[in-house]
Regions:
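N-terminal helix-turn-helix DNA-binding core of bacterial DNA-binding proteins
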Residues: 13, 31-74, 155-157
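Short amphipathic alpha-helical elements of helix-turn-helix/winged-helix folds
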Residues: 53-57, 142, 149
Length: 157
């Protein structure tokens, strides 16, 4: 087993290292999208992701939101607290299990969500103009494969 404290036998070409490239791409895309909604709606990236998940899958508990958006519990909890305070999200009662506290968008939250979704979809469409239709299908298929394989690798570590 290699010693992680020893000098590496080869240099890491960061600019071609897949995890780095994916992270940078995600950050650039996320920041560009954030620039569209941050000012008008005063939302952080995490807050919008929580709202997007609830807009699509509600009701969800905070833990379920975290699983859907692949984000740690602390970040989700903070975002949920801010959204609750602003009246964009509300807790619902789970009659079957009183320990559960599912979340959903409030009427105000649904209004904000409805105004951001077209901006997000328009940005996605502009981003995809860099690819032709075949490349887009390939990108989607390859992204799905890498996502599934990364999950398998993480479970098998």
């Amino acid at each position: 087993m290699p010693n992680p404290l020893q000098a590496p036998s080869q240099a890491l070409a960061l600019e071609s290292f897949l995890p780095y490239r994916l992270s940078v791409l995600a950050q650039v895309v996320s920041q560009a999208l954030h620039d569209l909604y941050a000012g008008p709606f005063d939302l952080a990236v995490t807050e919008w992701r929580v709202m997007a998940a609830l807009g699509r899958f509600a009701p969800l508990t905070a833990s379920e939101v975290g699983q859907r958006i692949v984000m740690d519990k602390v970040a989700v909890s903070r975002a949920v607290a801010r959204l609750l305070k602003r009246g964009l999200v509300e807790r619902t009662a789970d009659r079957a299990d009183r320990r559960r506290a599912p979340l959903k968008l409030s009427a105000r939250g649904r209004g904000v969500h409805a105004r951001i979704v077209p901006l997000a979809l328009e940005y996605e469409a502009r981003l995809y103009t860099a690819l032709n239709e075949q490349e887009r299908r390939q990108f989607d298929a390859l992204s799905d494969r890498l996502f599934i394989h990364a999950q398998v690798l993480r479970q098998n570590r």
